[in-house]
Amino acid sequence: MIENLDKLTSEQLEEVKKQLTQINSSIEEQQAQPIAEFFNKHGWVKIDKIINKETADLFYLYCVLATERLNVLEQIEGVGNVNPHHYGMFDDPQATGDYSKYGDLIFDTLLYALNDKMNLYTGIDLIPTYSYHRLYTTGTELTKHSDRPSCEISTTLCLGFDNSNLDKSKYENYLWPLYVKEKDGTEIPINLEQGDMLIYKGCELEHWRDRLMGNNHAQVFLHYNDKKGPHNIKYDGRPFLGMIDDEKTTIY
């Protein structure tokens, strides 16, 4: 505890603030070191509660309302007549029928905001490429795949889900596992609670999900590149964050 804090000059207070910031930064780096070591050994690592419940609830509701908005727009304008770049789509081949959207500003903001933590958790100097969010629905299966270069270092963050259709006596703690295949062939199931995030090497590790049993499940994917790597695709070729993918200056 700092004594006589009320007697310090403004310059002294600023110096104290600076020193405390440096101490906190050093502590955070020390705590992140074993996380980065695990990530670089296995190609993935799980981070618990990267965002709190209140923030996750807000993002989950955002995904649900965006889905309902697109449903209403398609009823008014007709299927295929709504701009997917602005309002999202239901025809992503990876999850046909489920709502998906590329590069939404709110999630690109989250992508940007987590950049420093991602640097610590991976031990890599990263650059943000793009975000992508999706609201999965009952029966959706994510087939085994790896990702394109802009997804070199990826995250998938659980925003929330609705399992109210399930029999609680059988599925009281049901989570929808994500599987990753490590380089040695080991297949690892990873369960994410609301607010949890998985960091993984999207281009190297195959990943997939079995069929979803719950009503819905919202995830956001946050993608990064290694600044010193072969790709370094800033903003996925877009001029800036929050821009739609047909405004790319470079195609990857």
Model-derived segments and their meaning:
Residues 2-121:
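Non-heme Fe(II)/2-oxoglutarate
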Residues 26-27, 31-47, 125, 132, ...:
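Catalytic phosphate/metal-binding cores of nucleic-acid and nucleotide-processing enzymes, i.e., regions
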Residues 235-252:
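Acidic/histidine-enriched, glycine/proline-rich intrinsically disordered or flexible terminal extensions
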Residues 46-49, 127-129, 199-200, 221:
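A structural signal for short, well-ordered beta-strand segments and their strand-loop junctions
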Residues 19, 43-44, 55-58, 161, ...:
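N-terminal secretory signal sequences
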Residues 138-204, 208, 216-220, 226-240:
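Catalytic core of non-heme Fe(II) oxygenases with the double-stranded beta-helix
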Residues 89-95, 99-100, 109-172:
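Conserved double-stranded beta-helix
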